């Protein structure tokens, strides 16, 4: 059962996912990571914990969303390898980043999925493609 979800990157897609996840009946705890301290506005949302760096709480998540820019992946991947649970599913929302690049960046230690969606996810009307 999914209880904890981590989202790395706090941009528009992350905001959409948070808003939609909080509308479901499931009681998810969401760990949100972003280096920009201005994104701490999410801390006022129930069940959302904001951190400026990836930490040990990543290992408690069953699903990890990568909602970052592709050029940041090489830095983030090191923290995922260090703190992530190898049983977690890592779902990449990074535009233009092939699945084999993600697998290699994570040392092929995680179950990885590439997902393409759009901003309509905030309304529950997005078309999403999963690889």
Question: Where are each of the predicted segments found?
Answer:
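NAD(P)+-binding Rossmann beta1-loop-alpha1 motif at the extreme N-terminus of oxidoreductases
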Residues: 1-52, 56, 125
């Amino acid at each position: 059962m999914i209880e904890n979800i981590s989202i790395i990157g706090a941009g528009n897609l992350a905001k959409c996912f948070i808003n939609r996840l909080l509308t479901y009946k499931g009681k998810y705890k969401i760990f949100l990571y972003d280096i920009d301290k201005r994104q701490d506005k999410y801390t006022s949302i129930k069940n959302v914990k904001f951190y400026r760096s990836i930490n040990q709480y990543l290992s408690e998540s069953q699903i990890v969303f990568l909602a970052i820019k592709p050029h940041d992946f090489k830095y983030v991947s090191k923290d995922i390898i260090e703190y992530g649970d190898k049983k977690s599913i890592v779902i990449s929302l990074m535009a233009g980043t092939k699945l084999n690049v993600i697998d290699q960046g994570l040392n092929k230690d995680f179950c990885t999925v590439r997902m393409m969606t759009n901003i309509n996810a905030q309304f529950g009307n997005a078309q999403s493609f999963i690889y």
